[in-house]
């Protein structure tokens, strides 16, 4: 069968993914005697479609799980999808509005019917896209956060925490989303600086013709003011202690109070206190027993309590009230000001502090083991720098607001009796049974009980995810949870370190007394090549599916990983996907070259034992490095090591060393070794580029349907000959120098040349002389005691080599070249010497790294010595 000149990923990818699925390669069993290796996919939202962050996260997980599978572990990658309360409800409401249907006109049941219909239609889109990337999940284990199992887990945990006193209901200041019309947790609010205004407003002092000036960024909340506060030691306002003031427009009398909370240097040093609409003002009001006047509706419009501008939006009122203050003589001045505004993570609405009755989790006690076990490295963060962020948050953790004023989600398992008594139970029947335990309620029926209408924060199901996907709450002794939990690694983004990572660790210790995962690998933020965060809304993010169609899934995977150092933001350039595709073509062409060779036992080809031994050593050297990279979660570094091993060492050197002359056969020994090398290279590349490696694996030799690289054994590194590697590297340096001389002298690449040395040839040269002659197109090698006239020199490890020309060389040109090279190596030597003179580097860097730098230094010194000698020689000095 004639092989295509180009690798075609479209023809290959669907074929092999379907084959892997049909063979059950991705299925994991708790009955296995293998070592388990478990990853739980961070469940994407059902509202989502694949974006570049998903591509990065999914690729990294697939690399880890495929490698573990090849290493003989029971690799279990559990996929899932999240119900995403706020995001999904927003989508469903918009869909209904487009049909002329308002949510307020529907019953809860009718709305949820629409939501489930929407979920069935759109909820699996992103999962199908993830499959196109090659994700080797155990799809039989697919979970949805509102499936029966996770839903029961949520109820059990809520009841358990409530009964232990960790969950409570209380009226507190919370973050309110006026667009989503729901409460938000503190970490669901994103803060960003916004250009605004500082309004200086006059408040008249009761019983005098004096006034006090107060600076505020929110004049619309004046209508809810219940006090003015000054610092007790601010001498400017000593005369106002115990006085009263009049609220402009509202004409309400309020007290002037004192509190050290006031910042004397902000504005005028006086603070208007609006307890209903500011977190700090509320705390101040509680200390001083102030009235709380809520002037806003849940949608951010002014309510009847405001007394003015009823039904108008808060930001419209801001402008109108400023104009009224100006017209009535209350506005002293307006200054530009930069405010830090809180925005809803989901709807991007400006968040309103609001006094509201909500459900909360007391988090401080639950956080203690989560804090300790990360700091002592029981759970390891990669990179470790994220421990500091994690520690700072847990040191200042606040109670978690878990109720949301939505319909889509897990309805809170709390039930109200007619007198307002709250009973927490699995369902109405269980709540009624609990009520009947009290004789007062013995005549109640289910019709007398109503369930809390709110749903739980989406993260309340997500924090249980590593346990609930294995039914660890419904059946804590089942084989899945006993075998697959805890998981090995969580791959996630640092922006949800608080939302999800910290809470999962809390849940792990609270409900299983074990860690949920052993490692957390934090990806970076995907940015464009200009450094801007990639976003479809900004128009700077490509469609991953379009990239897959153009470059192949392998090309896109490699492109992402080429640009993604762990924990650091990555600058993505579409050219990296092109580089990934080119790499696939390089592998395909190497395979075609090998398959095109004729194999004959009586081949006249010279013995290639040295080349075979060298590449075997080089493979094991790089494999050792790759394993070190994986241990430290430097996944991109591991890929780059493989890339260089294949592109440079295998294709550029080894294949050229053993390639037979045109029309000549290759020996069976060399051919077999070469095929085996390619097979081993395909194995270590497979986790990164699963499709092309599987295709070439099967093309390389006949195989059964079950004999797939997906389940082939991962190569084991063995000891290797360092001296052989060093000698080969020197030989390759010499060949490269010869090639460079050809280019600079405009000599045909294949024109045979003479090569002289004025010293005895080194041992490394002798061992690789056949390949130096073959790849350098050298037809004669000799030693000359005297100088070689009309020649160009090159230098390797202190040895000078000369290539004579039939025509006289341009002495000035050769002097210029030597001086330029000398200048470069002198600068190089200075840089290396500076690094080695740094005590901190020498003491803290790995010994192997320091040794490499010392070798660079000695090599540079030797080269400089030879070049200086050659300069003297040809200049006649």
Curated annotation (Swiss-Prot):
Top enzyme class: ligase
Binding residue positions for ATP: 536
Location (main, coarse): cytoplasm
Positions of short motif 'KMSKS' region: 533-537
Record field: catalytic activity: tRNA(Val) + L-valine + ATP = L-valyl-tRNA(Val) + AMP + diphosphate
Described purpose of this protein according to its UniProt entry: Catalyzes the attachment of valine to tRNA(Val). As ValRS can inadvertently accommodate and process structurally similar amino acids such as threonine, to avoid such errors, it has a 'posttransfer' editing activity that hydrolyzes mischarged Thr-tRNA(Val) in a tRNA-dependent manner.
Family matches, as PANTHER family: VALINE--TRNA LIGASE (PTHR11946:SF109), VALYL-TRNA SYNTHETASES (PTHR11946)
Full protein name: Valine--tRNA ligase
Source lineage: Bacteria, Pseudomonadati, Bacteroidota, Cytophagia, Cytophagales
